[in-house]
Each structure stands twice: as structure tokens, then as C-alpha cells.
Design a protein with these regions (language model features):
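N-terminal lobe/hinge region of extracytoplasmic solute-binding protein
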Residues: 50-105, 217
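Ligand-site clamp/hinge motif
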Residues: 206-213, 240-288, 411
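Detector for C-terminal structural segments
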Residues: 39, 228, 232, 329-356, ...
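Short helices/loops that flank or line small-molecule/ion binding pockets
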Residues: 123-125, 130, 264-275, 291, ...
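Secretory targeting and sorting signals
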Residues: 3-29
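Alpha-helical secondary-structure segments
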Residues: 48, 126-136, 177-183, 220-221, ...
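Gly/Pro-rich hinge or "lid" segments in bacterial periplasmic/extracellular proteins
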Residues: 82-87, 187-250, 254, 368, ...
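Surface-exposed binding/hinge segments that line
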Residues: 42, 111-113, 130-132, 139-204
Length: 545
């Protein structure tokens, strides 16, 4: 997920390594206590969080890690993930479904049955047909995740002329029996994990296809209220929520979330006692201060930060220019500049936590060679606009990148966009964005979430495109399509993915530079702190003293 940004009983689940270290805490503020429910002895009043941005609070539209961090506790899917720390958080478990599905031997037919008595936060009953409406709604509104569901029989045809009354033939529901049957046109090894994406969260059948930020009823432990675009939103308890052994009620009664793009300001809010938690990229010169005035958790997760180069736009339509950029970047220095070294320099698309990962070292830091390649490509003096978003670490990285492009002979300038519109702008074909900053946090732990979503030319769309490099290559596209059918990540399959990655990076549509370690900053009055590998800090399990 870039934007962000995960599982399964029928295919191998990778045990991604996670390492977190909780550091010393000092001064905080008084806890906001609530009356403790005998059903939940750790319940408390208000959790005050500060994050940098969201894109949407609409399950069929949202596609950033920050949005999903909140929405995971508002919208439930047929299958979901456990609220637990460590690798067990990658295990798929029933969500709205009463059990894991039955799957046909050919891997094409999936049968589910909903739990009894499910209701949305507005009190209306959950129907089996609401699942099909959620998928259709994504196509009707050109949602960012519709490409995940085109392997459902009839979905491709529906996508060409979507109408509210149209039908996706591969989805058959029975409201009276609470059953959902999904038939695929072709087997897809990661389909169960795709069903756990929030894009597939059922919504009431009368939900308007247009974007509905924070107003769509959900089935999770919380519901949204008081959404103020680009400023804040609030989460309160859903009175109709039915907890399961996998999905808890949640500890905070209310979650107040402020949207603050300036990392220094976000850090100061926690130090001052205005917020209990911040996920901002703490400025390097403030890390020591943060350790002394709160609790700092260093969270490792699967992510890659990179600069994309649009292969359709000059000068990046020339391979030598893209290779020059990769040689020019000092990845270690950039990581130190942006995060004080909290991360791991990389030249790979995949994070090192994946069994498909094979470390690449194609582009050693060599500015002289980069300049030579620019000259050989006839690109000296070419005008380039670097795109980034208005968040502290992205701006710093964008400034560095712009200076490097100028250093090797290009004529580059920086364009900083508002946080909320950045991805939709660079993902629009009419923008003709040449190059810029991006990151990807896994949606689910499978190479398809990286190569199919981000670098498969068959998935390019004119709007809300995730392939910012607009990279299309017949050879690697065909390999990705073939690997979709592999149900298990065997050593042989992992080796095939490693080959695809090397072939792509030899064509250099990206300049990957870091697998970041995330600093999560808490005030002293927070006690139990828990993480979930896919969704980050698990707000439902946080506690106050």
C-alpha cells in the first residue's frame, strides 16, 4: 500500500521477521480513565493519536497505510487477520464468515457462509448480497483496488460497462441462507488474501457508489464520526458490533485522530501531552529527545521506499538515464539524512523479509558513471520535475533527489503536492509525471502484492494507477501472470520471483533506496503497546495507565 499498502490457509504464509525494541520512557501526562467494563478490564476513555495523512475513509477507495490502520477496526471482511503481535498476525481467520471457506480442487470456487445476526453500525442487517455490492461499487467508482478482483468470473466484462443493476456472474449470493459463492475465471494463488483486503468489505446495498468519506456504516468495533478533511477524524464504539475470538471490542472508547504532516510538530504534540501517540518520522535530531520524554518503539515491517521513473516520459524513456539515477543515489547517506539511519539501504523491490528476496547489487554508488550515462543518452540539460508530497520525510527525500539529478546533468526542480491528493495526481495519466517519491507497505505477504500491483503493465490504469513508472514489459508481465497461478510459495516459485525482480531492476523503472524502520512515539501514560504486522500499531489493544 503506498500507499501503503498480507496470509492464507491454502498457500504458504511467510514468517516475516519482526524486531521491535521498546526504549526508555520519561515524562508524560495523566491518563484519561473511563469506567472499566467487566467484559473489558483494560477499557479506557480516549486515545489521542496524530498521523500524517489519509487518502480516504471509504473501504472501496482507501489505499494508504494510515487509512487502513484506522479502517481495519471499522470495516470487516469475510476473512481477516488476528489482533496479535508477531508472525501469527499473518494468519487468515474468519471475519464476517463463520469459518474459512470450502475451496474446489481446481482452485476456482470459494464458498462462504456469514455469521448469524450481523448488523452494521446503523442497525441494518448485513446481507450476503452486500459483498457483491461492495465489489461492484469499487468498479462503479473506479476504486483503487478493483484490479485485485478482475479474476472473478464476469468481473472483467462488468468493469467495461459497470452499472448498479449489472451482475458479476462469478458471485452468487443467497441472503436467506447467508451464503456467498465466488467463482474465478482462472485460479489465483493469493485469492484468499485478496478477500481480506478492505476493498472487499461488505457495505449496505444502498450505499452510493460515490466516495463517502467516514459516513459508510461498518461492522467493526468502531465507527467514524466528526470527519474534518485534512484535519481530523474521530472513532467511537459501534453499539452493534459482535466480537469474536479473533476480533476484540477494543480498549479505547474513543479515538481522536489529528492529521499533521509536519513531523516535528507531531512529535512535539506527544511531548507536550496533546497526543498519546504519533507515527510521524521523527526528525533525526530529535530522536534522543523523544527517547527521554516518552516511549519510542522501533517497528520493523515489510516496506520499500523508492523513486519511480515514468518510462513513457522523457528523459526517463531512456534506459541509460534510469540506470544513471540508480548509480547516482547514495542510499546510505539518504537514509541517514531522512531518518537518522533508521532503516536498511536497498536496491530491491522486495523487502528482505520475503523468502523470494535475493539481494541485488546492480548499481554501486558512482556519480562519475551516472554523469557518463546521462551524456551517452543525450539527456544533459533535460528538464525534469520531481514530484513528492507535503510530509516532512518525503520533502527531505525529494530535495535530495532533485539535487542529485541536477548534479548528474539534468535540469530538475521539485513540485510538492498536498498530502491528500498526491497519489491520485501522480497516478493520473494526464499528469504526465516524470519522476518522484513513493513508498509501498505490503497489503499482504506475497510477491504478487509488489510485482502485480506495482510493476505489471497489464494492471496500468489511466486513473488511480499504482504503477507510477508506467512500466510495461512483455517478458516480465507474462511471468507475473504465470506466477499468479502458483498456490504455494515453494523454493522453485520463490526463485522464479527473484528472477523477475532482477529482470525488472535491470530495466531500472525504480530507484529503491530504503526498507524503513518506523519510529512509533508514545506518551508516558501509555502502558501496553501492541503491533500487528500488516496494520502497524494495533489501536484496539493499546492501554493507558
Amino acid at each position: 500500500m503506498g500507499r501503503k499498502r498480507h496470509w492464507r490457509p491454502l498457500v504458504s504464509v511467510m514468517a516475516l521477521a519482526t524486531g521491535v525494541s521498546l526504549m526508555v520512557a520519561a515524562h508524560g501526562v495523566a491518563a484519561n480513565r473511563a469506567k472499566v467494563s467487566p467484559k473489558n478490564p483494560q477499557a479506557f476513555g480516549t486515545l489521542r493519536a496524530v498521523i500524517d495523512t489519509i487518502d480516504y475513509l471509504d473501504p472501496q477507495q482507501a489505499y494508504t497505510g494510515q487509512s487502513w490502520w484506522a479502517m481495519w477496526n471499522v470495516y470487516e471482511t469475510l476473512l481477516t487477520y488476528r489482533h496479535v503481535d508477531g508472525p501469527a498476525g499473518y494468519k487468515l481467520v474468519p471475519g464476517l464468515a463463520q469459518s474459512l471457506p470450502t475451496v474446489s480442487r481446481n482452485g476456482k470456487v470459494y464458498k462462504f457462509k456469514l455469521r448469524k445476526g450481523l448488523k452494521y453500525s446503523n442497525g441494518s442487517a448485513v446481507k450476503a448480497s452486500d459483498f457483491e455490492w461492495a465489489i461492484k461499487r469499487g468498479f462503479l467508482a473506479t476504486g483503487q483496488g478493483v484490479g485485485f478482483y478482475t479474476d472473478i468470473a464476469g468481473a472483467e466484462a462488468y468493469s467495461k460497462n459497470p452499472t448498479p443493476g449489472g451482475d458479476i456472474s462469478g458471485i452468487v449470493t443467497n441472503n436467506a441462507k447467508r451464503t456467498i459463492t465466488i467463482r474465478l475465471a482462472t485460479p489465483r494463488g493469493d485469492f484468499l488474501t485478496i478477500l481480506a483486503l478492505l476493498f472487499a468489505a461488505p457495505v449496505p446495498g444502498n450505499t452510493d457508489p460515490a466516495i463517502q468519506n467516514g459516513s459508510i456504516p461498518g461492522t467493526g468495533p468502531y465507527k467514524f464520526s466528526n470527519y474534518d478533511p485534512n484535519r481530523s477524524f474521530t472513532m467511537v464504539r459501534n453499539p452493534y458490533f459482535k466480537p469474536t475470538k479473533y476480533i476484540p471490542r477494543g480498549n479505547p472508547n474513543t479515538v481522536e485522530v489529528a492529521l499533521v504532516g509536519d513531523a516535528d510538530a507531531a512529535t512535539q504534540r506527544v511531548i507536550n501531552g496533546q497526543s498519546d501517540y504519533s507515527n510521524a518520522a521523527i526528525p533525526p535530531d530529535r530522536i534522543a529527545d523523544a527517547k527521554g520524554k516518552g516511549k519510542l518503539l522501533l517497528r520493523k515491517t515489510a516496506n520499500t521506499y523508492y523513486f519511480w521513473m515514468n518510462v513513457r516520459e522523457a528523459p526517463f524513456n531512456k534506459l541509460k538515464v534510469r540506470q544513471a539515477v540508480n548509480y547516482a543515489i547514495d542510499r546510505k547517506a539518504l537514509q541517514t539524512l531522512v531518518w537518522g539511519g533508521l532503516g536498511r539501504p536497498t536496491q530491491n523491490v522486495l523487502p528482505p523479509t520475503y523468502p523470494s528476496y535475493r539481494k541485488l547489487a546492480l548499481y554501486g554508488h558512482n556519480v562519475t558513471k551516472a554523469k557518463q550515462l546521462i551524456n551517452q543518452a543525450g539527456a544533459s540539460g533535460a528538464k525534469v520535475t520531481v514530484w513528492t508530497r507535503n510530509v516532512s520525510d518525503a520533502v527531505t527525500a525529494g530535495q535530495y533527489y532533485t539535487s542529485i539529478l541536477n548534479q548528474i546533468g539534468l535540469n530538475a526542480s521539485l513540485n510538492v503536492l498536498p498530502r491528500a491528493t498526491y497519489y491520485t495526481t501522480i497516478g493520473n495519466v494526464n499528469t504526465h509525471a516524470q519522476t518522484g517519491w513513493a513508498r509501498w507497505l505490503e497489503d499482504y505477504p506475497h510477491p504478487l502484492d509488489w510485482f502485480d500491483v506495482l510493476l505489471n503493465g497489464n494492471r496500468i490504469t489511466d486513473q488511480d494507477n499504482n504503477n507510477f513508472a508506467w512500466y510495461k514489459n512483455k517478458k516480465t508481465d507474462a511471468q507475473i501472470e504465470s506466477l499468479k497461478k502458483a498456490p504455494i510459495l515453494t523454493p522453485a516459485v520463490n526463485a522464479r520471483w527473484a528472477k523477475v525482480e532482477k529482470q525488472i531492476m535491470e530495466r531500472a523503472p525504480w530507484a529503491p533506496w530504503s526498507n524503513r524502520v518506523f519510529p512509533e512515539f508514545f506518551s508516558k501514560n501509555m502502558s501496553c503497546i501492541h503491533t500487528q504486522l500488516l496494520y502497524g500499531i494495533d489501536l484496539a489493544r493499546l492501554c493507558k495507565k
